[in-house]
């Protein structure tokens, strides 16, 4: 999936681990990811969490699409921070996924919740 995901590549997202029902990603905040306050734009954290959610849901074997997603920001993210997103399937056959986002100091910076729609199409 990552090989076709140009947006995740553009963000510099790196896969740390991916297996059935689990994914962990990272990204380092560069100058072009900051807002007018020289902090990471909120969309960067959201996008990392969204990609982590998508990779986790699709790792289950069926092509999945996002039905809904939301994020709560807990801490600011600064230039040169490395942020991590970790997602695991909560319950077998569940379509609700939680993604925890934290920084290199292991401080939780955001909570993301996504609801997936699973299609009948298999991932090849």
Regions found by a protein language model. Name each.
Residues 26-28, 86, 98-100:
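Beta-strand residues in well-ordered beta-sheet regions across diverse protein folds
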Residues 78-79, 89-124:
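HotDog/MaoC-like acyl-thioester-processing domains
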Residues 9-11, 21-23, 65-69, 81, ...:
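A generic structural signal for short beta-strands and their flanking turns/coil linkers
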Residues 54-83, 89-90:
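Hydrophobic beta-strand-centered segment that forms part of the acyl-chain substrate-binding groove
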Residues 37-54, 58:
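Compact, glycine-rich, soluble single-domain proteins
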Residues 1-6:
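N-proximal, solvent-exposed amphipathic alpha-helical segments enriched in charged/polar residues
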Residues 7-40:
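Catalytic strand-loop segment that frames the active site of acyl-thioester-processing enzymes
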């Amino acid at each position: 999936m990552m090989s076709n995901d140009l947006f995740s590549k553009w963000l510099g997202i790196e896969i740390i681990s991916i297996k059935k029902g689990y994914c962990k990603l990272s990204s380092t905040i560069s100058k072009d990811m900051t807002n007018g306050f020289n902090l990471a734009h909120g969309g960067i954290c959201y996008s990392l969490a969204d990609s982590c959610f998508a990779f986790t849901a699709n790792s289950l074997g069926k092509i999945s699409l996002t039905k809904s997603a939301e994020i709560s920001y807990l801490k600011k993210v600064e230039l040169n921070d490395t942020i991590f997103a970790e997602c695991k399937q909560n319950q077998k056959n569940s379509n609700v996924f939680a993604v925890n986002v934290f920084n290199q100091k292991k401080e939780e910076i955001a909570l993301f919740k996504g609801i997936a729609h699973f299609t009948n199409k298999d991932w090849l």
